[in-house]
Swiss-Prot record:
A matching Pfam family: FTHFS
Pathway connected to this protein: One-carbon metabolism; tetrahydrofolate interconversion
Annotated EC: 6.3.4.3
Keyword Ribonucleoprotein: no
Protein name: Formate--tetrahydrofolate ligase
Residues annotated for ATP binding in this entry: 69-76
GO biological process, one term: tetrahydrofolate interconversion
Organism per entry: Listeria welshimeri serovar 6b (strain ATCC 35897 / DSM 20650 / CCUG 15529 / CIP 8149 / NCTC 11857 / SLCC 5334 / V8)
Stored CDD domains: FTHFS
Source organism phylogeny: Bacteria, Bacillati, Bacillota, Bacilli, Bacillales
Keywords from the named record: ATP-binding, Ligase, Nucleotide-binding, One-carbon metabolism
SUPFAM superfamilies hit by this protein: P-loop containing nucleoside triphosphate hydrolases (SSF52540)
Highest taxon listed in the record's lineage: Bacteria
InterPro entries: Formate_THF_ligase, Formate_THF_ligase_CS, P-loop_NTPase
Amino acid sequence: MSNKVKSDIEIASKAEILPVTTIAKHLGLDADALELYGKYKAKLSYDTIHSLKDQEPGKLVLVTAINPTPAGEGKSTVTVGLGDALSKKDKKTVIALREPSLGPTMGIKGGATGGGYAQVIPMEDINLHFTGDFHAITAANNALSAFIDNHMQQGNELGIDGRRIVWKRVVDLNDRALRKVVVGLGGPVQGVPREDGFDITVASEIMAIICLASDLKDLKKRLSEIVIGYNYKKEPITVGEMGYEGALTLLLKDALKPNLVQTLEHTPAIVHGGPFANIAHGCNSVSATSTALRLGDYVVTEAGFGADLGAEKFLDIKVPALGKAPDCVVIVATIRALKMHGGALKTELSEENVEALAKGFTNLQKHTESIQTFGIPYVVAINKFITDSDAEVAKLEALCEEHGIPFSLTEVWEKGGDGGLELADKVIAAVESGEADYNRIYDDAWSMEEKLEAIVTKVYGGIGVELSSKAQKQIVEFKKYGWDRYPICMAKTQYSLSDDPTLLGRPTDFVIHIREFIPKLGAGFVVALTGDVMTMPGLPKKPAALNMDVDENGNAQGLF
């Protein structure tokens, strides 16, 4: 390998990419099972998905992580590299990932196709517009907003109270200027003036619905159950009452179909859906994971950010919908993130600091304990970076051994599947041990307060919950409507176990502050907004987009 570090886009652009029909053959599917989007991308048809439903599912491996740095810790990279490594171990493997959002792609974190020699391709297409799923979701979401405003303009038969509309418009970009807007200005013929706002598309309830719906019938039912706001009697109003679930389903009928692509090493990858884990449930679609489980012996999937967010939601929200719990969990840890949790400055994470690493190790410990609470065996993947010193690697390995934490030093970014062979061996051993005994940490019949308490104490390590006066009133209201039976989806900072992004490591004796609840009945959960978390991110001072370009031949530059 050359000493020069190649960029992700350089590696991906020079890769040998097979026709997606060839990838489908590896899974036992012929060309008729696909709806082609060019030569290298395809959607799986409804007939194909339905034909697989009665097949026995394979083994499921969930990849999660410790609390990350702003740049991310390579969870997607490890997911892809582990999938390739399992393929090299002669396991029929399928990778199931979320689709990237243009917000972080253009912002600071970059895309979500992995990195180095562990990527899904065509990465340029996937990181930009892919098969148009996010655009369809954006269109459906904003169509509903248009229907709401038109209903109010055309007589307002349902008595929608414009002050109590909870449905927001969306765009798949980080755009802080759109968080609060006023619509309907310009006089009587321009609409009814009201306050509105934009979320990022991945925070839309329709995104969550796409990712949790089992089929078109279920999609339509879930869309009809969306609460758009309240009438003047303070009663909830749903899409079903407005009568637009059919039109929304029509807009989304193709977006519900999972997308098939491949890794650099030609392992099949089903990439579909993309809710964030800090402001939504953070998992790819049930349809994609379920289909992958029936096509492969091993399925490697991921859940966003740390185990306190994506993994908790995967295990408490997605697993009941999927009907299958993971057989093993992989927790991705990096030396740079552990140093940050140990007090090292963000500007100094590339410098050797064994002391900070040892201090930050407690963050990893907490996440291993949380996964054990769910009754699932785990392996820690130490995702090696080129800036990691030998002394730091040795210290982290020694700490894992000292505390009985199973681990593997993973170098898939540099070596592809070959860099994850030991991790694959340990994952196979964990899966075949049969030790998985899934325990959900709360029951849907529990009160909202009890569910919140379970998440905060068992997963975050906090001591309790503090509800704002608004949240307290909402709990009374939600009980009245029977909404308290839904799972809780916490909207919380990804950087800390607490709701304070500056409280790193393993904080104790903290409470989680709930400022507001948002009913997402179509998705089938209630969102609890904590701290200052935003559902529309902003751009950094120097967005990644500054380094992006396209040459005269149409080749992308600067994507990662």
